[in-house]
Amino acid sequence: GADEMCPPGWSSNGVYCYMLFKEPKTWDEAEKFCNKQGKDGHLLSIESKKEEILVDIVVSENIGKMYKIWTGLSERSKEQHCSSRWSDGSFFRSYEIAIRYSECFVLEKQSVFRTWVATPCENTFPFMCKYPVPR
């Protein structure tokens, strides 16, 4: 199957490998950790509805219904005031976002409602890493 190209325990959609890590880290620690997991590894970015569904499945299998996990989204990497970037450089395109005056974003889910919540980067949360499937 598609998972053969990712290490054991990692999930794949054929394009990326994904793994949820439950040990809480700060945003910076988590991003550095993800950088080491694979070539071009980063904190989770979600670039499509399909990817969002896969992430949902991986997270609910591991954490259950209520969760907050770090995403690769941070206000620090902003180039202009209206564009946020994921840590892997791709642009963030979603309207379900609650921007306050802090810098990093967790994905928070309560049953079916998914929201992006701005949270101080020093807080610690579980997180998901993602890197391209090795070719």
Curated annotation (Swiss-Prot):
Q: Which Pfam families match?
A: Lectin_C
Q: Which SUPFAM superfamilies match?
A: C-type lectin-like (SSF56436)
Domain of life, per UniProt, equals Eukaryota
Q: Which SMART domains match?
A: CLECT
Keywords for this protein? Disulfide bond, Hemostasis impairing toxin, Platelet aggregation activating toxin, Platelet aggregation inhibiting toxin, Secreted, Signal, Toxin
Q: Name one GO molecular function term.
A: toxin activity
Xref: PROSITE patterns: C_TYPE_LECTIN_2
Q: Which InterPro entries match?
A: C-type_lectin-like, C-type_lectin-like/link_sf, C-type_lectin/snaclec_domain, CTDL_fold
Q: In which tissues is it expressed?
A: Expressed by the venom gland.
Q: Which GO terms describe its cellular component?
A: extracellular region
Q: List the disulfide bonds.
A: C6-C17, C34-C129, C104-C121
- Signal peptide start and end residues: 1-4
The record, for Gene3D superfamilies, names: Mannose-Binding Protein A, subunit A
Q: Where in the cell is it found?
A: Secreted
- Name all C-type lectin domain ranges: 13-130
Assembly and interaction partners: Heterodimer of subunits alpha and beta; disulfide-linked.
Entry's family note: Belongs to the snaclec family.
Annotated function: Binding of echicetin to GPIbalpha (GP1BA) receptor on platelets alone results in inhibition of platelet aggregation, while binding to both GP1BA receptor and IgMk promotes platelet aggregation and signal transduction.
Task: State the name under which the record lists this protein.
Answer: Snaclec echicetin subunit alpha
The beginning of the lineage is:
Eukaryota, Metazoa, Chordata, Craniata, Vertebrata
